[in-house]
Amino acid sequence: MKILILIALFAISLVSIDNAFAEEAKTPIKMKIGIEIMNIGEINKETGAYELFFWVSETSDDYDFTKQPPPIIDYENGYVEEITAISVKEHFYKFKARGTFFNAMDYREHPFNKLNLAIHIKSVIPNTLDNLQFEVDQKFSGIRKESFVSVPGWEIKDPYFFVSNQTYPWGEFSRFSAVVPVESSTTGVILKYFVPAILIAAFAFSTYWIPASYSDEKIEILAATLVGAIFYHVTYLSAGIPSVQYLTFADKVMLSLYTIFGMSLINVLLHKKLEHELKENYTVVVERKLNIKFRILTPIFAIIVLLITILF
């Protein structure tokens, strides 16, 4: 009888131990991750690559960094080239890093470019989601407010941070993301990209005030400005971005401006046609009325073309 009681107690103790281990195994390590952006390097609009200087902090009451190395982390969308200023405490680990990262760019609004400068940190095997879970450490996350944190030609917006889960055939993992949105300067884009193009088109539009007797000179002006507009479009407006299979906003604006050249050329040809048909009846009054119509119709057609390309 005593032997049976001892066996029963031993079995119960084994079950208790197994349950304890099961509970311990089911309790993942909670680790707070913080990223503070110190500086932003070059942004390559063609490849979507960008260089970042930042601090990474790892905080966990469940992890002793003095007794074991920090969990291995993977920078999903780039690589770290240099790590310095490592600081280790019992439940705190921090280092400074410099790395190059990549993110997809949508060029549909070019040259009003927008890019999310993101850093994605993911745990790796054996630290699946049931072993390690990231949390956002707001205390050590952000971007320095000093004036040297800037990118020429870009405006830096407020960063944001979040944690998500990534599922793969080999397991589910925790991922921490830091995102710094940047946008092209609106004023700079208008002055550098669109004002020159509009000025070139204005030369073509000005031919409506040149008398029809100078039609050869008008054609020369139109030809020269059209070549200049095409050259500007291809070599400057489309510079710095890859060849894409859709129209950018710059392409749509240029298509509407090409309408001005087309209407101006049609105006010259109509004057030639009327001059040939009416001969002595082709008066200054007829010429002036035709020019007035084209001065009104040309901007209307240009706006219609722009709206069509934007909407469709």
Say what each PLM segment does.
Residues 22-181:
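Soluble non-transmembrane domains of integral membrane proteins
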Residues 5-15:
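Bacterial N-terminal signal peptides
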Residues 307-312:
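Juxtamembrane boundary at the C-terminal end of a transmembrane helix
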Residues 16, 20-22:
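Boundary at the C-terminal end of the N-terminal hydrophobic targeting segment
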Residues 177-301:
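Channel- or pocket-lining gating/hinge segments that regulate access to a cavity or pore
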